[in-house]
């Protein structure tokens, strides 16, 4: 606190990684203040156009934490509200223009990261770098793929389409976000416990974690319409998907980033007869290894939640 606090605050204020306007909210999202009382990670799915209603906040919305929203509200996904089925078609958030007292889409609704997500398909290593994207994976040496990423500020449905009645059947999508750690250099190793290596970060502000929804590898192709909204053609019906004019269409993965406490567990010494490599070329059972580690992680999560008397949903599990 005495030596780094002022510099840390200055770095957070000048960083493009945070979208919050108020200092306390931004510091809370960066892990320097507790998140209690700050609903800044909530994202809305707009069911009606606030510009037509003439007021904010809009009442015709469905709200989710961003960790859930990047899946549930992603373009093409359907949700049910008041016995009606709504389909998300793109990304938008709104703001009040004090100059002419109107409501308009935010210019940065898509919230594109200036740096790409560098990800290795072979071993799963990933990082969001500030400059000089990595070409080779530092873990396995294979080529890294560079992915455009964004953290949408809101989502919306086709306002011109009448929602269908819910008859018990709709397109449900299972969550497909992967948990990606981006704090390797800040993890401290502790004494081995029963052949288990334990590492964690000493400060929550050092624990950068990304939840990534890449649409099962197909990404989300979004372009900007003449109203400043970002729309996915694939989520629209014919013939609108072909006739709509969109600018600067590009593919993105959705990311929800946060700073938090991180705990990693691994096996210290492995018998030569057992291969735990996550790389398929080295281990044909790599998918089974991943499943086993994830099962272990969920078991540990359940034990921690029971011991601390918290909801298990407050803890995320990933294979890294």
Which residues fall in each region the model found?
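Extended, highly charged accessory segments
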Residues: 1-96, 130-320
């Amino acid at each position: 606190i005495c030596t780094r606090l002022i510099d840390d605050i200055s770095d957070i204020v000048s960083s493009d990684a945070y979208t919050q306007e108020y200092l306390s909210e931004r510091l809370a999202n960066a892990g320097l203040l507790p998140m209690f009382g700050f609903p800044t990670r909530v994202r809305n799915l707009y069911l009606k156009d606030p510009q037509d209603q003439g007021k904010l906040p809009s009442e015709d919305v469905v709200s989710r934490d961003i960790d859930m929203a990047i899946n549930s509200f992603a373009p093409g996904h359907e949700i049910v509200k008041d016995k009606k089925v709504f389909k998300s078609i793109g990304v938008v958030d709104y703001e009040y223009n004090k100059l002419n007292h109107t409501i308009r889409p935010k210019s940065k609704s898509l919230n594109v990261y200036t740096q790409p997500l560098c990800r290795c398909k072979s071993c799963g290593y990933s990082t969001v770098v500030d400059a000089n994207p990595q070409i080779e994976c530092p873990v396995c040496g294979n080529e890294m793929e560079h992915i455009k990423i964004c953290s949408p500020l809101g989502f919306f449905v086709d306002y011109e389409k009448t929602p269908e009645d819910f008859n018990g059947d709709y397109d449900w999508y299972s969550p497909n976000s992967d948990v990606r750690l981006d704090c390797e250099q800040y993890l401290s190793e502790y004494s081995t416990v029963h052949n288990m290596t334990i590492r964690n970060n000493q400060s929550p502000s050092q624990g950068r974690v990304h939840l990534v929804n890449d649409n099962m590898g197909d990404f989300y192709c979004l372009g900007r319409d003449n109203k400043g909204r970002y729309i996915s053609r694939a989520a629209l019906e014919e013939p609108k998907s072909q006739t709509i004019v969109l600018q600067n269409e590009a593919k993105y993965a959705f990311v929800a980033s946060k700073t938090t406490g991180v705990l990693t567990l691994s096996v210290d010494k492995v018998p030569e007869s057992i291969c735990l490599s996550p790389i398929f070329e080295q281990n044909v059972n790599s998918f089974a290894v991943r499943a086993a580690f994830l099962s272990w992680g969920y078991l540990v999560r359940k034990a921690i939640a029971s011991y601390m008397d918290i909801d298990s949903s407050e803890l995320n599990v990933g294979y890294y």
